[in-house]
From Swiss-Prot:
Coiled-coil stretches noted in the UniProt entry, renumbered to this chain: none
Cited HAMAP family: Ribosomal_bS20 (MF_00500)
One GO MF term: small ribosomal subunit rRNA binding
GO annotation, cellular component aspect: cytosol; small ribosomal subunit
Protein's UniProt name: Small ribosomal subunit protein bS20
Transmembrane segments: none
Name of the gene encoding the protein in the UniProt record: rpsT
Source species of the chain: Alkaliphilus oremlandii (strain OhILAs) (Clostridium oremlandii (strain OhILAs))
Amino acid sequence: MANIKSAQKRILVINKKTARNRMIKSQLKTAIRRFEESLAAGNFEEAKTRLKLVEKKLHQAAAKGTIHKAKASRKVSRLATKLNKAI
């Protein structure tokens, strides 16, 4: 543990941010997995709605700084391409 008070505070803040980022990334992975499962099952209408949800979550994560803005856009683009190829 750090001895300096500001360093102790930074440790607490970093732990909170790490927990938040981990939670957001887990939600992203789950949303993407559900989209791909519905796509693999052939439920294209469900996949379209799930893609909208994934897009929303990705852009929210980018806005919070959890992932980079370009990474969010790239993932949305690739998932949309997957959906369009499957239809």
